[in-house]
Regions:
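Short strand-turn-strand beta-turns centered on an Asx-Gly dipeptide
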Residues: 137-140
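An extended, acidic
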Residues: 142-267
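Generic detector of well-ordered alpha-helical packing
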Residues: 41, 64, 81-84, 88, ...
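Short acidic/glycine-enriched loop/turn segments that link adjacent beta-strands
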Residues: 32, 122, 237-240
Length: 267
């Protein structure tokens, strides 16, 4: 945990400097609605350097540079150096550094053993270790206890042009079912923080389609260690392109609505 937090703190210093001079950053386009800036690349380079120095035998899966290290890794870092790039580039102070530590299991599967989601703008460090619990800085986290869907506040990510038409259709159906049945749906633009906020009880649930592993690997563990459920679109513990997270009372219904939406995509 100390390794992850130290690496994130070092990358955060540079990101905060870049955020204050965001209009001077060079920006390129990876795809429709998908941007990468000098800030992303510099933060990723810092995180890579710090993590490799501390744990030289570990694998790496990073948003901008992909997978590196041995294919036979026993442990691997999953890193998003800047989750919420579009917010960052527009001067919106809602973005985060996300780091997860993945362990390979004897059966060939894997699990996330430790995670942090760090928002440098306000100094909130969400973190969790498997079996130890989830924390915001030094305060223990618990998901909300809300049971009534009509009183629940949800978060999501909107699939833009970079995602498939099927994902957009599935999202529209799920959102259409949720909007009249809840207290509201928010879209703030950082999957890692959305999950961390579910763990903190700020949101009662969150779902997204067309997501990447580095966006959600850390946040899913934080939700689970805070007493919530974080699954794929089938209700399994996999890190997949669909994520559904909520407190234990609301997750079954949210998952049902997401499945209904995904059925529209397949149809």
């Amino acid at each position: 945990m100390t390794v992850m937090q130290n690496a994130a703190n070092k990358a955060a210093k540079r990101l905060l400097r870049d955020f204050m001079e965001v209009e001077n950053l060079q920006v390129s386009v990876k795809g429709p609605g998908d941007f990468v800036s000098q800030a992303d690349m510099r933060a990723e380079a810092t995180l890579r350097e710090e993590l490799e120095k501390a744990r030289p035998g570990y694998g790496l899966l990073m948003e901008e540079s992909g997978a590196s290290g041995s294919d036979k890794w026993a442990w691997r870092w999953i890193v998003d150096p800047l989750d919420g790039t579009t917010n960052f580039l527009h001067g919106i102070p809602h973005w985060a550094i996300s780091i997860a530590l993945e362990k390979r299991l004897p059966d060939g599967g894997s699990e996330i053993n430790a995670a942090i989601v760090y928002c440098p703008v306000n100094g909130e460090m969400f973190w969790a270790e498997k079996g130890v619990g989830a924390y915001l800085n030094d305060r223990r986290l618990r998901v909300s206890a809300r049971r009534d869907f009509k009183e629940a506040l949800f978060a999501t990510g909107i699939p833009f042009a970079a995602t498939s038409a099927g994902n957009r259709l599935a999202f529209a159906r799920t959102l259409g079912a949720l909007m009249p049945a809840t207290a509201g749906v928010r879209r703030f633009g950082s999957a890692a923080l959305d999950l961390a906020w579910v763990a903190a009880g700020r949101y009662d649930g969150y779902w997204e389609m067309g997501i990447k592993p580095w966006d959600i690997a850390a946040g899913m563990l934080i939700v689970r260690e805070a007493g919530g459920y974080a699954t794929d679109g089938e209700g399994k513990d996999n890190i997949d392109s669909v994520v559904v997270a909520a407190n234990p009372h609301l997750h079954p219904k949210l998952l049902e609505l997401v499945r209904d939406g995904l059925a529209a995509k397949q149809g």
